[in-house]
């Protein structure tokens, strides 16, 4: 994309993309954290009412959350705590960049709905770490590769409320 390789926590192919992603190096991780922070700061400077950070649906941050797509053996892979590290570091940099008085929403999939992906218990644990980093959480379900609808108009209203109510209980955030 844009003449650059797709980045991912590990070189694990996706059925959606036809290219093998490049495993992120320590330098990539550092740069991407700063890119998120810079983008959030620009949103604030340009008059946005808040910023949303997408940790759902098989996008980059959610790839780190899943043992299926995150097969790293360093501090960003393996244990649940390590898989949470990069998304939490991104959110910490975003919060630092925009300040406490600017709303930050985090979008998560309450479950990846993938055989070897993450489940609700994982996301309850992740959401419990968002206090001070986020002001609210938007909850959906699944990834684009999951066998459930992902397009909003294909999903009945309230379909993921069972996931969001559990996330709210563990995070204390709306």
Residue ranges and their predicted role:
Residues 1-174:
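Flavin-dependent oxidoreductase catalytic cores
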